[in-house]
Amino acid sequence: MTLESYAGDVHTVPQSENSMEERGGGELFVPPLNFAMVDNGIFRSGFPEPVSFSFLQSLRLKSIIYLCPEAYPEVNREFAKSNGIQVFQFGIERCKEPFVNIPDEVIREALQVLLDTENHPVLIHCKSGKHRTGCLVGCVRKIQRWCLSSIFDEYQRFAAAKARISDQRFMELFDISNLKHTPLSFSCSKRYTNTIDY
């Protein structure tokens, strides 16, 4: 089985036994843990291991948003450098405590990078691709005017049994009023609107 993602929806697709083996030049394409497409040019995942580098190359990434405070491993830095990928690090501490707040200002800085289409295609990741990544994606969804129940559903699809009330509260209370409200050029609704002739 493999997972295909379309704007946050995860679908299971049956595969033949050999379908993960050779693609094109005989390389193995293995997506990182919790990989999904958020929107056109925006992807999310857990920490990319070297086995996923060929897959990531196929995305032709321009940028990576890394949401952990730990130094980026040398092998990942070399991969980014050799592929012309700029890495933006926003160190958000891993937190399991229920009343510890996610740093609002760090999420805002990460959003500025994420919303700049010059940085697309971009991969957002933390260690597991659940909590920190889920909060940043949830804030993007608020900007895209998703309702809270849909934002929480998407968050819970990735966090599963480890969903945190504190993360959901952060997304609910995150104030988007002072963010630049230009149409998001990567959003599906804008893309379809531009193709209609009146």
UniProtKB/Swiss-Prot annotation:
The similarity annotation says: Belongs to the protein-tyrosine phosphatase family. Atypical dual-specificity phosphatase Siw14-like subfamily.
The reaction(s) catalysed by this protein are:
5-diphospho-1D-myo-inositol 1,2,3,4,6-pentakisphosphate + H2O = 1D-myo-inositol hexakisphosphate + phosphate + H(+); 1,5-bis(diphospho)-1D-myo-inositol 2,3,4,6-tetrakisphosphate + H2O = 1-diphospho-1D-myo-inositol 2,3,4,5,6-pentakisphosphate + phosphate + 2 H(+); 3,5-bis(diphospho)-1D-myo-inositol 1,2,4,6-tetrakisphosphate + H2O = 3-diphospho-1D-myo-inositol 1,2,4,5,6-pentakisphosphate + phosphate + 2 H(+); 6-diphospho-1D-myo-inositol pentakisphosphate + H2O = 1D-myo-inositol hexakisphosphate + phosphate + H(+)
Locate the Tyrosine-protein phosphatase domain: which residues?
Answer: 34-188
Under the heading InterPro entries, the entry gives: PFA-DSPs, Prot-tyrosine_phosphatase-like, Siw14-like, Tyr_Pase_AS, Tyr_Pase_dom, TYR_PHOSPHATASE_DUAL_dom
Q: Does the keyword Hydrolase apply?
A: yes
Region labeled WPD loop important for active site topology — which residues? 90-102
One Gene Ontology biological process: regulation of defense response to bacterium
Highest taxon of the lineage: Eukaryota
Segments for region (Disordered): 1-23
Which EC class is the enzyme in? hydrolase
Tell me if Glycoprotein is a UniProt keyword of this record: no
Q: What is this protein called?
A: Inositol diphosphatase DSP4
Name the organs or tissues of expression: Highly expressed in flowers and at lower levels in roots, leaves, stems and siliques.
Keywords, ordered alphabetically = Hydrolase, Plant defense
Function according to Swiss-Prot or TrEMBL: Cleaves the beta-phosphate at the 5-position of soluble inositol pyrophosphates. Has highest activity on 5-diphosphoinositol 1,2,3,4,6-pentakisphosphate (5-InsP(7)), 1,5-bis-diphosphoinositol 2,3,4,6-tetrakisphosphate (1,5-InsP(8)) and 3,5-InsP(8). Acts as a negative regulator of defense responses against the bacterial pathogen Pseudomonas syringae pv tomato strain DC3000.
EC number of the protein: 3.6.1.52
Gene Ontology terms, MF aspect: inositol-1,5-bisdiphosphate-2,3,4,6-tetrakisphosphate 5-diphosphatase activity; inositol-3,5-bisdiphosphate-2,3,4,6-tetrakisphosphate 5-diphosphatase activity; inositol-5-diphosphate-1,2,3,4,6-pentakisphosphate diphosphatase activity; protein tyrosine phosphatase activity
Q: SUPFAM superfamilies, alphabetically?
A: (Phosphotyrosine protein) phosphatases II
Q: Where is this site: Transition state stabilizer?
A: R132
Residues the entry annotates as binding 1D-myo-inositol hexakisphosphate: N101, I102
Q: Which organism is it from?
A: Arabidopsis thaliana
Q: Where is the active site?
A: C126 (phosphocysteine intermediate)
